[in-house]
Amino acid sequence: MLFREGTRLINSRNWAKLVRPEAVINNMESNTTTYGRFEYEPLERGYGITIGNALRRVLLSSLQGAAFVSVKILGVQHEFTTIPGILEDVTDIILNLKQVRLAMDTDEPQHLSLFVSKKGIVTAADIQTNQHVEVLNPEQHIATLTEDIELRMEFEVRMGKGYVPAEMHEDLHEEIGLIKLDSSFSPIRNVTYVVEQARVGQMTNYDKLVLEVWTDGSVSPEDAIAYSAKIIKDQISVFINFDERISGSGGNEGSGSSDLNDNLFKGIDELELSVRATNCLRSANISTVGELVQKAEADMLKTKNFGKKSLDEIKALLTSMGLDFGMKIDGFEKKYQEWKRKQHHEA
């Protein structure tokens, strides 16, 4: 569990001896495109609050989304006015526009429009979108025309994060009739978490994190959590001031194959995996555990017929071996050949 980097002795027991979550349990029966409930266990005591609070803060503050940043209404010079033939005043119309949820697949600002001329209710479904923008809640009420008049609007949509008040859109050109809007970019509607007790064997002093996420539909709850975890990982990885290595169980030091976890040299066929998972790994040309752990989870999910169920199965097995996806093993193929030669000589 010790290895050297230059003159420093790195003690990997600091992280290797901690219990690690086996998998994220996705409650598929209750989950929808806008709601997700996830269980994450086992965790060391106190980690439930630490991880839950960090994820919640990042989910609510840092994910990108689309929103209106400005509107122009034909015949209207400012928001503190009324429009003849429309029930709502301009202030109420703007409040309704802020409730329209959008999805956008580009970072470039987009311009949309709305035109109606018949008496009746105007909703977000009347907004004329393009190939880059989708209205997620077309039923959202915008205005009520009490007579046959023309209502024309032009919108600018941008990507952003968090909440940006109208006065912060400083780069928008000041012009008569342009009304800047407060923009709520966050695709997350709400996040809650609770920490419960978890059991590992006969020990019950572990945490289970139960996380619930509500989104506007522009991102799935599962992806929202994944993005937030990635943000946290990227922000704190700068504190790791050494190259991570995989230390063996015997505390050996050195640069040969002896300082690696022996499980890395196992063939895929030696693992107690389902036939489906094994076949998926073969189709991805993965023949050893060492090759497997150097893959990223996202890359594995791109493999044909490889789904979340197979991923969770393999992650649980790797965890039991003290391994995980995304590991860095310099010169693994060379070390694997050395290990095979050693096994051959010993036989």
From Swiss-Prot:
The N-terminal domain is essential for RNAP assembly and basal transcription, whereas the C-terminal domain is involved in interaction with transcriptional regulators and with upstream promoter elements. DNA-dependent RNA polymerase catalyzes the transcription of DNA into RNA using the four ribonucleoside triphosphates as substrates. Its EC number is 2.7.7.6. It comes from the Bacteria. NCBIfam families: PRK05182.1-2 (NF003513), PRK05182.2-5 (NF003519), rpoA (TIGR02027). HAMAP family: RNApol_bact_RpoA. This is DNA-directed RNA polymerase subunit alpha. Gene3D superfamilies: 5' to 3' exonuclease, C-terminal subdomain, DNA-directed RNA polymerase, insert domain, RNA polymerase, RBP11-like subunit. The gene is rpoA. Belongs to the RNA polymerase alpha chain family. The lineage of its organism: Bacteria, Pseudomonadati, Thermodesulfobacteriota, Desulfovibrionia, Desulfovibrionales. SUPFAM superfamilies: C-terminal domain of RNA polymerase alpha subunit (SSF47789), Insert subdomain of RNA polymerase alpha subunit (SSF56553), RBP11-like subunits of RNA polymerase (SSF55257). One of its GO terms (biological process) is DNA-templated transcription. It catalyses: RNA(n) + a ribonucleoside 5'-triphosphate = RNA(n+1) + diphosphate. SMART domains: RPOLD (SM00662). Residues 255-347 are annotated as: Alpha C-terminal domain (alpha-CTD). Residues 1-243 are annotated as: Alpha N-terminal domain (alpha-NTD). Homodimer. The RNAP catalytic core consists of 2 alpha, 1 beta, 1 beta' and 1 omega subunit. When a sigma factor is associated with the core the holoenzyme is formed, which can initiate transcription. Keywords: DNA-directed RNA polymerase, Nucleotidyltransferase, Transcription, Transferase. GO terms for cellular component: cytoplasm; DNA-directed RNA polymerase complex. GO terms for molecular function: DNA binding; DNA-directed RNA polymerase activity; protein dimerization activity. Pfam families: RNA_pol_A_bac, RNA_pol_A_CTD, RNA_pol_L.
